Amino acid sequence: MSNDKWKMKSLRLMIVAGEASGDAHGASLVNALREATPEINFEFFGATGLRMRAAAVESIVDTDKLSLMGLWEIGTALPKFLDAYRRLKVAATERNPDAVVLIDWPEFNLRLARWLHRRGTRVIYYISPQLWAWRSYRARSIRRDVDLLLSILPFEKEWYASRGITNVEYVGHPLAGNVVAAYDRNEFCRRHNLDPNSPIISLLPGSRHKELARILPPMIDAAANISKQRADIQFVLVIAPNRDPKEAQEIISAHDPPLANLRLIHHGTREALAASDAAAIASGTATLEAALLGTPMVIVYKESPINWHVLGKLINVENYGLVNLIAGRTVVTELMQQDCNGERMAKELLDLLPSERNSSLRGELQRIAGRLGEAGASQRAAEKILSFIQSTTPSS
């Protein structure tokens, strides 16, 4: 966008992302906005994680401290969420941003969108809530309170249109074309003292504390079970960047007997996945990273019983994993709740290792990855946001 068409020399945006994945996408968006219009003086502030802060977004709310899971956990942490909500409202009132970009995190952001819309602030929702999967009734909140909805999955625009929501732009998935390993399997093994000639299984329990507490124990049980059958298999436990490795180490230390063939890494998720023959991954964005890297996987998840009971009444789809939802069928095994146990997980992971099955699933994942769109989603999202703000800004 050339500067002779741009109406403002400065632009103030509030950005709100509450999950680790949203924080990463927010950082990419901020960088894309700066690159698209270097002549604009941007001011970014809002609810941030590590990556948005690294992208020089001023933090009004540190969302690393709000990274929870489930309805019950949100209820017990309600004072923290209310305080975050209050501080963002104060910041929006005092600074009067030109627009607010809400990234995913619908439990919080849809409520904030309602307040912002009422005060006349332009609301842009990037990475639209997965209402097609559960709680579809919230589409009315999108219709009422969101001025521009940027979707990242190919079928979402049509889904929203069928519900009378037409201010939707499909930009593609931010991960498409951007998920690459910095180095190959041999280098990964060298750095982590692994044998490149022996099978490697990665374990990714998620980015929230409660995910570690619920999902990591059965993962460790699965690794122990597999080790009894195949002593040659090596395990890599990948800790999310926003988590303290000590949290995982405490869980690992509690296992008896201790696992001798487990490597714990804090960074290098993509390198670990690319080097792996198979992986067990908590349902979420990491499963798409694995698909883009072609890593055969088992998708796992475990909620508290009360949350699972409530969610079961709200979910509208047969599959839970994004990989299967995008495929439109079950390609990757999903182990949810009671099925997320060490014995079952061990069996499914072992089933992924034979070369014929492994190669077949890698081919399926490559086809699914192709449905995520072309590279440059953050740049396209930035262009849509800039065009929207320009078109809705009155001439001086």
For the regions a protein language model found, what residue spans apply to each?
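Nucleotide-activated sugar donor-binding and catalytic core shared by glycosyltransferases
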Residues: 3-396
